[in-house]
Amino acid sequence: MKFTEFSRSQWRVLLILMLVNFANYVDRQIIFSLFPSIRHDFDLTYVQLGYLATAFTVVLSLSTFPLGMLADRISRRTVIGAGVLFWSCATFFSGWAGSFRSLLTARSLVGVGEAAYTPAGAAVISASFPPQIRARVQGVFDIGMFVGGATGIALGGVMAQSFGWRPAFFLVGIPGLLLGLSALRLPEPPASLSRERMPVRELLRVPAFLALLVSGWFSSFAGYAYVAWGPELVQDYKGFSAREAGLALALAVVLGGTCGIATGAYLSDLLAKLRSWGRAVIIPVGFVLGAPAIYFSLHAASKLGFLFFFGLGAFFLSWYHGPLTATIHDLVPPRGHASALGFYYLFVNLFSMAIAPVVIGRIADHYNLITALHVPILAQLAGAAFFLVVIYCIRRNGLHHPVLARHWNDEPCTAFVPAVALTVEGS
């Protein structure tokens, strides 16, 4: 199936959810470009800045799994729309924070809203398109994440220097309200075509999924460390102003990341046609190739050299986005797609992303930020090693592990109108 063969309903689902993902990551990442201004206003340490990111991530992590389970049981449209409206309001009110504590509270509430979106949105995408192109459509969905994150970083830098950090939160909160209302108008999905639920304890008996969790722990630690401390790195060590820092990082991430998402998703779907484990191969390859690029970016002597190597690192590291979600959904029956992805994000966010900003901040306080950012390079290599275990488990047991066999025998759960999911209208 080609992109030109998508029905109008499929394009509508993909476009709206990609735009919501864009807004999701604008709201999520904009704070990192605002760190220097917030630190100056509230007289904070690096560790306190790390706590701002960690509080958001802890709440996001704890909320993702139960909201993912909820999305497998009720209307995914309602879960998505309510989450978007909630996080947009919390982002807007972040601009009114009068103290470090009130800003910490507001950012934590943003985490609740955003936790509702990713598992439900990704489950809807997988249910709306054939498995043969699963990595590519998930890649399109994730392009919203990359472009949104880069836009948040760039916009934050420009707004902080021109107007201050508070108007930045006001500006990005409003569009999310409109997108939340649009999400509520998507076709109403059935929660599931089966009354029986897939217990998570059964999923935890699948070796490939367990190895995937460990790999995700390391790779998420690395990715979040780069995102959290990238703006501080380029301003304190690479000679960029606040405005230049946001724009420069956005350019490197958008060009490298979006090209990497497209490349990784295409290669993943291509390799999936050859072997059951083929889709997963692209992930550790990207992690390994990205490590030297990030290392050279840290030690680049010029701005141009930094941007080249950082963009190259973003290219390779972003190979995993589409294939990761596609691999999880390949391993899990449709009725458990949102729950499985929610549990994955609970684990990797709570136990890696939540601690990454603080760990790197503490090392930076004792040594320096460049030294601290060597730690995530080692973490991404560890993530690659554990994903080789995922591949081994798939080769040994297949994609459909015997533990979950009874759940695969039911009719697949489609997230939206049955005519939209799995087939092209008129085919």
Spans of model-derived segments:
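C-terminal membrane-cytosol helix-exit motif in multi-pass small-molecule transporters
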Residues: 173-192, 386-391
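Conserved MFS/SLC helix-loop-helix module at the cytosolic interface between two early adjacent transmembrane helices
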Residues: 62-98
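Juxtamembrane intracellular "pre-TM" segments in multi-pass secondary transporters
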Residues: 2-6, 188-213, 237, 411
